[in-house]
UniProtKB/Swiss-Prot annotation:
Protein name: Minor tail protein Gp28
């Protein structure tokens, strides 16, 4: 090894490496620190002697924690005495290997079993639950009685748009703009003093706009929850919304890692000086997509992961993956001996199926394609009903003019009659007969019955078909105008839903050999990409790239249980469907705003 000139130096390096591994293993086996705090985040006590404690991290969803205490436990008595404490909310804070789980109590139960065993069970919801209780106002800077424009809408990189949307609504909630504060007796909650961030309960972590490499999207809402507003965007673009409580005298300032990103020393210095209150929830979004850089959808044990790009097949609907070659580039942090983690550009964590590997259980499912033809509609395409109505009106008016001209000859004997235009009358009578008859439905066939390549890793070059016996037709459920972008988008979504596809979920053990913990405590964590293999897969040595969806901890009377890790396979998204969905979302936003 370069730099080693003697056996003693090599042995010294070996001892350092073993010491580092020993410390890491001790940190992994160390029991978690569990705290109960009141509604002002003041520490009430450290939890010890619990009967059961389990908590889970779920990507972009609310995790649940359950704590069971004996009824004689002093913290159990404190929790049950909700009338005897000034701040009734109970906050659980669990710290394990750099990961911090915090959330508020949802409810508690006093349980007595048949055996006579009694205990208190407390259920907590992760702080992510707050996203379901923050509304995205049309205009967060005005009163609800006056909301102009009609819809909140912002366009740009997905991460930036979502964080700006969250920030302006947190600003509204934290600064009491034009409203009476939650606690009128607290001067710091009134307009003016409330702009002091040291009193805020939530804050968004700032970041440079120009460094946002996430895909371009549009965020809009009309008093919907931030969770509903952001959920699909986070899923589509593989972004992970994170929230972590800042604890004074224990954590570094959450903005310390922004040094060097802005390139403006005064700004970076000011960010480090922003005062934050104890227990403030810091919101951020992690980009695990690898968008705009090379990434992996699969690979092989023999060749390693391969870089790929999503494409479209000849029918414009079937997605595929093109593998391209070139010089591989790897993230710079991989060359640092102090880095511990993974990068979406080049994931290195791989789990192999076998009797002695870390995979405890796995499930790989294949779903065959179904229908070969798809229908949509119910209403005539734009312009058809209107055109027929115009022709009926014109025809009726011409008929009226002809009748009046024939009746004009009776004017000489005083019998002239001037009829009013009959076009409107005829259109009202005939409208139920011709409306939504012509061009009201559309059909889009597919090439599934003939030979096509499967958009599944390892099978892209194999041409197969459904055969002569197959399902025939499917139809979009909701009625809509035929031959519109919305109809094409709905059909594309239905085709995508009924395509041949795979699903892959696993449960793996911790430290076998990879450690599950946030950077820099573990090799991988929520949202990170990892490689997996499938038992009996037809392509030998084939690897899939999965994303970690869920991490669950459990401690009971027998001590710490093995981690439950759920990993789910995410297929490359059909780019044509994505474009049509974005157009559909844009049309919906413009319709809500009253522009379209």
């Amino acid at each position: 090894m370069s730099g080693l000139t003697s056996v003693a130096q090599a042995e010294d390096l070996w001892r350092k490496i073993q010491l580092r591994r020993c410390k890491r293993e001790q940190e992994r086996l160390k029991p978690p620190d569990v705290e109960l705090r009141d509604g002002d985040f003041r520490l009430r006590g450290l939890v010890a002697g619990e009967r059961l404690l389990e908590w889970e991290f779920i990507e972009n969803e609310t995790g649940v924690a359950t704590l069971q205490l004996s009824l004689s436990h002093y913290l159990a008595k404190w929790v049950m005495n909700h009338r005897g404490r000034a701040k009734r909310n109970v906050i659980l804070n669990v710290e394990k290997q750099g990961a911090r789980w915090s959330g508020m109590m949802d409810h508690y139960r006093v349980v007595k079993e048949d055996s006579g065993d009694c205990y208190l069970e407390i259920v907590f919801l992760h702080d992510f639950e707050q996203t379901k209780h923050i509304r995205v106002w049309c205009n967060p800077f005005l009163r609800p009685e006056l909301q102009f424009p009609k819809i909140w809408i912002i366009f740009g990189p997905a991460k930036w748009c979502l964080l700006v949307t969250l920030f302006v609504n947190l600003l509204r909630l934290e600064t009491s703009l034009w409203t009476i504060p939650d606690d009128p007796t607290d001067i710091w909650e009134w307009m003016g003093p409330s702009f002091n961030p040291s009193k805020w309960r939530n804050i968004v972590k700032p970041f440079p706009f120009l460094l946002d490499n996430s895909p371009i999207t549009m965020v809009f809402s009309r008093f919907g929850t931030f969770y509903d507003t952001a959920k699909q965007i986070l899923e589509n673009h593989q972004l992970t919304l994170t929230c972590r409580r800042y604890i004074k005298d224990r954590d570094p300032h959450p903005f310390d890692d922004l040094k060097g990103l802005w390139g403006i020393d005064p700004v970076e210095g000011l960010l480090q000086l922003i005062p934050l209150r104890d227990g403030c929830v810091v919101w951020d979004i992690e980009d695990n997509s690898g968008w705009g850089t090379e990434t992996a959808f699969g690979g092989s044990w023999l060749t390693g992961f391969v870089r790929a790009v999503v494409n479209l097949a000849g029918d414009g609907q079937v997605e595929g993956v093109d593998v391209f070659t070139g010089d591989y580039t790897f993230p710079g942090e991989y060359y640092s001996p102090w880095f511990l983690g993974t990068s979406p550009r080049a994931p290195h964590v791989v789990f192999e199926e076998g009797p002695l590997t870390g995979i405890k259980s796995s499930e790989f499912s294949y779903y065959e394609a179904t229908d070969t033809s798809f229908l949509a509609g119910g209403q005539s395409a734009p312009g058809i009903n209107e055109g027929i109505s115009a022709l009926v009106n014109i025809g009726g008016d011409l008929l009226t003019s002809f009748i009046n001209s024939q009746l004009a000859v009776l004017g000489a004997v005083g019998g002239a009659i001037d009829l009013p235009p009959l076009g409107g009358l005829m259109d009202a009578v005939l409208n139920p007969l011709y409306s939504d008859v012509f061009g009201a439905f559309m059909e889009v066939p597919t090439l599934r019955a003939m030979g096509i390549s499967l958009p599944i890793a390892g099978l892209e070059d194999i041409v197969t078909g459904l055969g002569d016996f197959h399902y025939y037709e499917n139809m979009v459920d909701s009625p809509m105008k035929a031959f519109t972008l919305s109809a094409f988008a709905a059909i594309a979504a239905q085709i995508h839903k009924t395509r041949a596809r795979t699903a892959h979920t696993l449960k793996v053990s911790d430290a076998a050999p990879y450690i599950f913990a946030p950077k820099p405590y573990g090799h991988c964590w929520i949202g990170d990409r990892v490689g997996t293999s499938v038992l009996g897969y037809p392509v030998e040595h084939q690897l899939f790239v999965e994303r970690i969806r869920k991490v669950k901890y459990r401690i009971d009377k027998d001590g710490m249980k093995p981690l439950e890790i759920e990993i789910g396979y995410r297929e490359p998204k059909n780019p044509a469907l994505h474009i049509l969905e974005e157009i559909k979302r844009f049309n919906g936003a413009m319709g809500q705003a009253g522009i379209l």
